[in-house]
Amino acid sequence: MLGENGIELKFVCIDVANGYMFKLIDFCKRIRELLPDVTLIAGNVVSREITEELVINGKIDIIKVGIGSGAVCTTRLQTGVGMAQLSAVMECADAAHGLNAALVSDGGICHPGDLGKAFGGGADFVMLGSMLAGHTECPGDLITDTDGTQYKLFYGMSSDTAMNKYHGGVASYRSSEGKTVRVPYKGDVQDTINNMLGGVRSTCTYIGASRIKDISKCATFVRVNRQVNTFYK
């Protein structure tokens, strides 16, 4: 299918903060009827039941998983709602893969090693924001502070900043569920991407996986109290 500008349309992402709504499932059905050959992505959710519902009745190809795990998201603090990202990925991946659907893990990525953990939990794709923030390619102005430090603003889509920018302010019946932070300027994004890709390659080497698809088959998770040696902080 071709879009208005003549570009071939291959993917459509139906993105809402709360995927636990019958309206979303009905909307996904209608989009599928309009776009029978397009890959449909929908979320966000964190549990088995709604994953199955979206795949079976919503006709979704890829489920987007994660509530409250983003670096600039405050949903868990404001609402008490959310689930540990790895636990959510493991539960939803089991349901999605059983129905021949795929899964994208959205949020919770702080270091390159977190990519390997997401893939190890069963994610087919990983979506991230904070590690890519602050680069030349990111939108927004490069701001120079009085001391010469350069930074860019990074904010959640449910933050005051986003709602003032896109919706004319925060509605009186709701609260902000995101924050705005200053991210030190990092330069070109390619260096960060190379670092992340290198981390994933090393993950595969350590656990004996020949490709990303095999990481979940080779990974074993162990609960620890301290992930790294903090002698030199």
Task: List where the protein language model places each region.
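Short, surface-exposed alpha-helical recognition segments that flank or form part
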Residues: D15, G19, D188-D191
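Short beta-strand/loop segments at the ligand-binding rim of alpha/beta enzyme cores
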Residues: E8-F11, I31-V46, I62, A95-G107
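Active-site-proximal beta-alpha core segment in soluble small-molecule metabolic enzymes
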Residues: M1-E8
